[in-house]
A protein has these predicted regions:
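Nucleotidyltransferase catalytic core that binds NTPs
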Residues: 2-424
Length: 424
């Protein structure tokens, strides 16, 4: 008897051959390879990481890992392990757990995972969590003693490798913020407020040098329609669906954003998120903002399980025409946000939904904003500067040694090869 899942997957690949065939075909082939667990149960794959300053590159890695199995279990490294191996994390474990749990490709999360997979922890993964394969990117993960953090998994023949997402890393994001503070001392309390003001206004003694440095990145993010399709949901609101709309910059997408989106999603059937343009954010919050570009911010929001659709480059003001076009039932805004004084603005961006009686202010569960993260960097920027210098060297080595990645199907090589990198 034919497998109905097989026919469904094949139909998915066939239906979109005239448009974005690579996405559907990749999903189909990945599913073909991940089937066939000896016990007949779902294939469970494991990926771990620090997930500090979580970004769309992390999310894309989790998406690729999930495509190699039926269930994705994610280990989040403890604060103590990160400090011992890399330096202080910007976001503590509780915030990193919120971020990882919110990624729509994640099925289960293990807190306080070790930085290196020990024999004991590997056995726990295989026996207790029923993990079939351990996944990691093709960028090296080297311990302080120079050994491979995944050596045991490779030796056991249970290791699979995916391609890292180029153009972004936590090191790069922290580096973007450090550009404004690299020549300042944080020993003087007075300097803290000065640095924060400079971050908002863009004024610094050597601003021209800072701008020049920001153009010399090792790798640059190049958005493609294929990546957006991979992150998008294949759903639209029904005719009677209650559509909830929330907008913002969503810069340095963090736990505060996630928790607000979770509450917003609970108020309706479909959550539509508007992502403001780079120009709008800069005009309202200073020339150094946003830290992440419009497409980078959009991908981070799209990866969130509470989000159904995004408007890439949403208008600052919510108009009546926009409400009608998207059939919006409710417009919401959090109490903890960068622009909480919007009602004092000459042109209140929410004037129309307020007049229509469809506007609601949400009590934000967490007192975290993008500025909160920037202040953490500013307060301890010397430690992050040292960490970045060390990490940047390894990233440079990775990019110098990388080989061309083809868009052709990567599944001709056996899935059970330890060295093959899967691109999905």
């Amino acid at each position: 008897m034919p497998n109905p899942d097989h026919n469904r997957d094949k139909l998915l690949a066939t239906c979109i051959l005239g448009g974005v065939a690579a996405v559907g075909l990749t999903i189909y082939l990945a599913r073909c390879h991940r089937r066939g667990s000896p016990s007949g149960r779902p294939v469970r794959v494991y990926m771990d990481g620090c997930f500090d300053m979580m970004h769309y590159g992390h999310c894309n890695a989790l998406r690729q890992a999930r495509a190699l199995g039926d269930q994705l279990v994610v280990g989040v490294v403890s604060d103590a392990e990160i400090i011992a191996n890399k330096g202080p994390p910007v976001t503590p474990l509780n915030e990193r757990m919120i971020m990882v749990r919110a990624v729509k490709w994640v099925d289960e999360v293990i807190p306080d995972a070790p930085y290196a997979i020990t024999e004991e922890f590997m056995r726990k993964l295989f026996d207790e969590y029923k993990i079939d394969f351990i996944i990691h990117g093709d960028d090296p993960c080297v311990l302080p003693d120079g050994t491979d953090a995944y050596a045991l998994a490779k030796k056991a023949g249970r290791y699979k490798q995916i391609k890292r997402t180029e153009g972004v890393s936590s090191t790069d994001i922290v580096g973007r913020m450090l550009l404004c503070v690299r020549e300042r001392s944080v020993s003087d309390v007075q300097n803290h407020s000065t640095l924060q003001r400079q971050f908002s206004t863009g004024r610094s003694p050597k601003f021209d040098d800072v701008v020049s440095d920001s153009r010399t990145k090792i790798s640059q993010f190049l958005p493609t329609s294929r990546r957006i399709v991979q992150f998008s949901n294949e759903k639209s609101p029904g005719p009677d669906a209650r559509v909830v709309y929330i907008d913002g910059a969503f810069d340095l997408f963090h736990a505060g954003h996630v928790e607000t989106l979770r509450i917003a999603r609970g108020l309706g059937d479909f959550l539509l998120v508007g992502i403001h343009t780079d120009q709008s954010v800069s005009a309202k919050r200073g020339v150094h903002r946003p830290i992440m570009s419009l497409h980078e911010r959009s991908l981070s929001v799209l990866a969130c399980r509470y989000v159904d659709e995004v408007i890439i480059g949403a208008p600052w003001e919510v108009s009546r025409d926009m409400i009608t076009t998207f059939n919006i039932s409710l417009v919401v805004h959090g109490t903890t946000a960068e622009n909480t004084d919007f009602q004092k603005e000459q042109n209140n961006p929410y004037a129309v939904p307020i007049s229509m009686g469809i506007f609601k202010v949400l009590e934000s569960p967490l007192d975290i904003t993008t500025t909160t993260l920037i202040r953490r960097i500013v307060a301890n920027h010397e430690a992050y500067q040292k960490r970045n210098e060390k990490k940047a060297a390894s990233e440079k080595k990775y990019y110098e040694g990388k080989t061309r990645t083809s868009y052709n199907c990567p599944y001709r090589t056996s899935m059970y090869s330890e060295t093959h990198s899967f691109i999905v």
